[in-house]
């Protein structure tokens, strides 16, 4: 099309070809749906019935560093240290077999009863004190605070003692607490030589009664990671120090291991040493200038001795009540299986007492005439407030509980029947007869206690429940914070039935 300059009604049209491009934005698919965990407040109904349960005075005595065995390898004196976990396995009575004050409280055909822990107090006896640990052959090469000429002897170990990190904690749940520590791992293709640094592996285990706490030297399996048995004190050099895995217990789907927890830790470093031995990792040359007087650098594996500092009654977590209103997880204090696990650590009462016995009498003092012994004592008193709850076992709730813990339905006599089998089963009469083929062994019966293989301090409260809350210290505190008045006598139930009204006699004035 041609046009002149004088053409007035002329317009220019620009045509552009459309170009298709694929969508460059990423498409995110929805995640795979997972089963939703609901809170116990959704399907558990709380009642207004409360019980008090308390233990007697719990005492334990032993050697603070190691267990003492007899000639037949039987333990004569157990190891009892202020730096051990005390894990109490508290067994509760079955509320479905309990004598309740109101028979119409629940329907046994469609409902079941269970306990909810709403109050706890851990009583601690014995005075405050700091326990001391050590090693007669502690691997102390130099005091790096007070430098001197390095000792080149093959054995520079010395008798060193110290106090540990100060720890107070207790964890409440219906399952045992989970601990974490570092253990010896495995190398790929077995490519390790003698003297190589062992690989580390993060390990989760159940914290049992008697396990050592983390004392300031790390949560390690010292038996496999320190073969010289002299880098740490006696009581942990062949043991595993565990630390509660708060992250895993807080992220637990059902929240059974930790309803709530309290902890207080403090530590400072008292002495600074370096360890003797051949250096496994050499210092790179670019990090220092070589010396003519000391051609070989000394030990650069530096270590320290911890200290928990002063203990005070103003910083105590024990001997005071705690009320559980809202748990950190989905389990709001429900005691599944009629059990509670209470984990306690208190290093502020870790005093080790020395005992002396005379072996030979003499007019003058002679140290060899006396035998010195070491012991540690602990004292506990546990008190709980439990609330009676009921749960209606609908098909949906039963399926949910079966997915959570099938043993609960078995204990409530609500077992799920196995799927029907259409095949015909063969059954021999004489199973021990040599005339028939060898029969498969009978599978072992599942133990009723899933924690029978673990070590706990068992506390049975089956005979210690009472509704008279005002007769116990924790019960009176519970009534006070609820604003309820103590009961003087129990109210008797009204007698059913009708009685004929008595006719009043009229007065006649004369």
Swiss-Prot record:
Belongs to the papillomaviridae L1 protein family. One of its GO terms (biological process) is endocytosis involved in viral entry into host cell. InterPro entries: Capsid_L1_Papillomavir, Capsid_L1_sf_Papillomavir, dsDNA_vir_gr_I_capsid. The keyword Protease does not apply. This is Major capsid protein L1. Forms an icosahedral capsid with a T=7 symmetry and a 50 nm diameter. The capsid is composed of 72 pentamers linked to each other by disulfide bonds and associated with L2 proteins. Binds to heparan sulfate proteoglycans on cell surface of basal layer keratinocytes to provide initial virion attachment. This binding mediates a conformational change in the virus capsid that facilitates efficient infection. The virion enters the host cell via endocytosis. During virus trafficking, L1 protein dissociates from the viral DNA and the genomic DNA is released to the host nucleus. One of its GO terms (cellular component) is T=7 icosahedral viral capsid. Keywords: Capsid protein, Disulfide bond, Host nucleus, Host-virus interaction, Late protein, T=7 icosahedral capsid protein, Viral attachment to host cell, Viral penetration into host cytoplasm, Virion, Virus endocytosis by host, Virus entry into host cell. Self-assembles into homopentamers. The capsid has an icosahedral symmetry and consists of 72 capsomers, with each capsomer being a pentamer of L1. Interacts with the minor capsid protein L2; this interaction is necessary for viral genome encapsidation. Interacts with protein E2; this interaction enhances E2-dependent replication and transcription activation. GO terms for molecular function: structural molecule activity. It is found in: Virion; Host nucleus.
